[in-house]
Amino acid sequence: LCDRYGVDALRYFLLREIPFGNDGIFSNEALINRINADLANDLGNLLSRSVAMIEKYFGGTLPAQRKAEPLDDELAAMVEALPAKVTACMDVLQVPNALAEIFRVIQRANKYIDETAPWVLAKDEANLPRLAAVLYNLCEVLRVAAVLLTPFLPNTTPKMAQQLGLTAESMRFETLGR
């Protein structure tokens, strides 16, 4: 299984699907469905789209000038609350719930892309500060998710950090909420 799907994907599936200390049901179909839904469609899609848009619209580097809007507040609040939610779940060994919390924010970020339509913003140079804010928010979701997913996906998250151009310091748990 590890050779076919990868250690991180298998570890993620087992931790996401089987509550700690309990028996669980395994099937190849369930494994493939979870990998496709969470890791490929949600996380992979968010990372791929975000990195591609930063490269396409800003040459790989986000400008400092950004224009935030009220639509950003919900996503920012979810990201800010996420480390405490994950920690609370982990404190009582509710690993599947911790992972569900992380992926709830990732799913919200994918919806945020559709709501903010960065490809439309990019058509007008006057919207570039707004576009920068949208892409910054997506990068922050990905950074926080990568930090929180590191214990579960230790081979995957360094690759995410590299694609996002994150420093080792920004990948430390202690940096969350700053």
Regions found by a protein language model. Name each.
Residues 47-86, 106, 110-127, 131:
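Conserved, charged catalytic cores of large soluble enzymes
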Residues 1-5, 31-42, 67, 71-79, ...:
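Secondary-structure capping and boundary motifs in well-ordered enzyme cores
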Residues 23-28, 80-88:
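Short, charged/polar, low-complexity loop and linker segments
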Residues 9, 30, 74, 78, ...:
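Exposed alpha-helical structural elements
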Residues 24, 88, 93-94, 103-178:
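Basic, alpha-helical terminal appendages of large translation-related enzymes
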Residues 1-70, 166-178:
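Catalytic adenosine-cofactor/nucleotide-binding cores of aminoacyl-tRNA synthetases and other
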Residues 19, 37, 63, 70, ...:
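Proline-rich intrinsically disordered, low-complexity coils
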